[in-house]
Amino acid sequence: MSEENQVNAADTQATQQPVLQIQRIYVKDVSFEAPNLPHIFQQDWEPKLSFDLSTEAKQVGDDLYEVCLNISVETTMESSGDVAFICEVKQAGVFTISGLEEMQMAHCLTSQCPNMLFPYARELVSSLVNRGTFPALNLSPVNFDALFMDYLQRQEQAEQTTEEENKDVH
């Protein structure tokens, strides 16, 4: 009987262990536009780069989550303001995630999973820009942990502001 209890205790501990597994990584959407070709190549290459990044996450099954990393890069010419190119990539993945508390789950979905997706998205952006025969564009690494901490601080400040406004009303 004691052996059976030990086995059940071991099974319980095993099921409570945090799990994060990649099931699939894929391109959900991609767009590359170079509206001013070929005359843009006749200008001096003095680009002004605009970079936007966001993430989305949704549950798609039991312990299955889709995380999408959205990257948008727009390059315009400093001198003329002409758009050289616009590159938009939605790199996504399905992850098995379990055994996490609420804050750990939020960190996993907004930091750890996007961190796994970023190299794929960065390579795709680089490849698309290269196929447009523009100079190489290598996106710098992103610190998703710092972005998550910044998000938490903004949320905390917003909650404090709301509490202060509610105190002023009463």
UniProtKB/Swiss-Prot annotation:
SUPFAM superfamilies, sorted: SecB-like (SSF54611)
Compartments in which it is found: Cytoplasm
Entry GO terms, CC: cytoplasm
Keywords: Chaperone, Cytoplasm, Protein transport, Translocation, Transport
NCBIfam families on file: PRK05751.1-4 (NF004393), secB (TIGR00809)
Assigned protein family: Belongs to the SecB family.
Protein name: Protein-export protein SecB
Organism: Pasteurella multocida (strain Pm70)
